[in-house]
Amino acid sequence: MVVCIFVDESQNYFSMKRTDLLFALAIVAIFLPFALCPALYEWYKAFNAAHGMVMSFLKFGILSTMGEMLGCRISTGRYITPNFGVLPRMIVWGVLGMGINMAMIIFSKGTPMFMEYMGMESAVECFAAEEFTMNKLWVALAVSVAMNTIFAPVFMTLHKITDAHIAANGGSLKALITPIPMAERFAAINWQAQWGFVFKKTIPLFWYPAHTITFLLPAEQRVLFAALLGIVLGVLLALSTKKGK
């Protein structure tokens, strides 16, 4: 009996190690071709410039879903659970990613103009300049604070609701055509964890500085960097889930 238990545990251990390796290789496979093939990277930049919303859908759909799979691995020991729903999550993340791109455009354009309205000279010019200056840093920080204070809580709550809706529909694509019972989903949120950890801690301690760096990058690189942060988001959500329990 003891031997059987040991064998089963060993098989599970090596199975998880194998899936961890495959997950890491999948991440490398996504980015390595762009590093090895300059022509492919140039095509990506051109397509991204011409079809920014399409690329936002793809970047967030792939990378943020992988981030949630990593979070699932941390919280449950597996990358996918029966109700996880990879395909519906990818589609929902793609739509959310387009919303994030829209928010980044709105706040990166509007916040510097508001700062000039409030008396800061040349905020728009400083933010648009290629060279790094302290003024550019302050504007980038202001953009990040504005976006994450106004937009992020609504986005995070909607994301929480869509996750619960997908799980309630067994992780199937049916979730995409089934109306969301918003009041029920909203009431079911663990607000102790949502406010006490997700809003109160991750926004000021992680997202403010992370998106400050994002807004210091050239405009064409911001959405990709934000999508990469989706992997970090998956880890943070996993920690939030553990705290909620």
Regions found by a protein language model. Name each.
Residues A24-E42:
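Alpha-helical transmembrane segments of multi-pass membrane proteins
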Residues G97-M118, L141-L173:
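Transmembrane alpha-helix/helix-exit interface in multi-pass inner-membrane proteins
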Residues S75-S108:
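Hydrophobic/aromatic-rich structural module bridging two neighboring secondary-structure elements via a short loop
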